[in-house]
């Protein structure tokens, strides 16, 4: 997941929490992420690709990616460089981490290409996780043209992910029909929403008086 974070760094949190719980159950979990994400409060300072860091029992592997300020060409280049680094180092990844399951879960579906190749090389299962419908979101909510080259590239990548996955995991319970139309086998769909770690929400604070008065 290009944008994977942690409680200290900031979003995205889902990869961290799922990986942490899997690690508690005895699984050896590795997250490969980009060194820069617009979603994080802080980003790791690294000087080279494949810098490793352990956070709460989960191994993070950082790929050096470009910084960007907005949804422009710089962000697209960051996506490209992340996926290119994964593809170029797929043999190294397989030999070092020996995966039996590979999950692609970045917001954008381009990571399905290197993830599938890594899984195939390792003889591993390939899972694609969807939490934002790209490119559907880009033209339905973002106003981009379906003929935009970026949208077209994302559509090819999304279709590839659905066709090649052994399982497609989604936070969206009603996405199955759409995914099936784009190549997913119906029985490959799994709906897994975000969970809640109850003991991390035990601390309660008194509601400020101005809020109580307003409501």
Feature annotation, model-predicted:
Residues 45-50, 202-215:
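A short helix/loop element that forms part of the nucleotide-sugar donor recognition site in Leloir-type
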Residues 18-27:
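A short, Lys/Arg-enriched amphipathic alpha-helix followed by its capping loop at the start of a domain
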Residues 1-15, 33:
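Nucleotide-activated donor-dependent transferases that construct or modify glycoconjugates
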Residues 2, 6, 67-76, 96-97, ...:
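Acceptor-binding helix/loop patch of EC 2.4 sugar-transfer enzymes
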Residues 31-94:
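A conserved catalytic-core segment of Leloir-type glycosyltransferases
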Residues 35, 174, 192-195:
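Carbohydrate-associated surface elements
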Residues 91, 110-113, 117-122, 148-168:
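Membrane-proximal helix-turn-helix segments that form the acceptor-binding/catalytic region
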Residues 7, 76-91, 99-124, 128-137:
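An aromatic- and histidine-rich active-site surface loop
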């Amino acid at each position: 997941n290009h944008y994977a974070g942690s409680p200290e760094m900031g979003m995205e949190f889902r990869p961290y929490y799922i990986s942490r719980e899997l690690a508690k159950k005895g699984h050896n979990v590795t997250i490969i992420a980009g060194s820069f994400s617009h979603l994080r409060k802080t980003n790791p300072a690294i000087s080279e690709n494949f810098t490793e860091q352990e956070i709460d029992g989960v191994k993070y592997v950082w790929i050096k990616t470009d910084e960007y300020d907005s949804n422009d060409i710089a962000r697209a280049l960051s996506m490209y460089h992340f996926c290119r680094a994964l593809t170029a180092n797929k043999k190294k990844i397989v030999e070092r981490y020996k995966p039996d399951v590979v999950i692609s879960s970045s917001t954008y579906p381009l990571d399905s290409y290197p993830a599938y190749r890594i899984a195939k090389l390792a003889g591993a299962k390939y899972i694609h996780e969807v939490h934002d419908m790209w490119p559907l979101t880009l033209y339905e909510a973002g106003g981009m043209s379906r003929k935009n080259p970026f949208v077209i590239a994302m559509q090819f990548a999304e279709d590839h992910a659905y066709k090649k996955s052994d399982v497609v995991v989604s936070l969206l319970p009603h996405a199955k029909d759409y995914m099936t139309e784009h190549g997913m086998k119906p029985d490959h769909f799994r709906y897994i929403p975000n969970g809640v770690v109850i003991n991390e929400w035990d601390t309660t604070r008194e509601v400020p008086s101005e809020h109580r008065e307003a409501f």
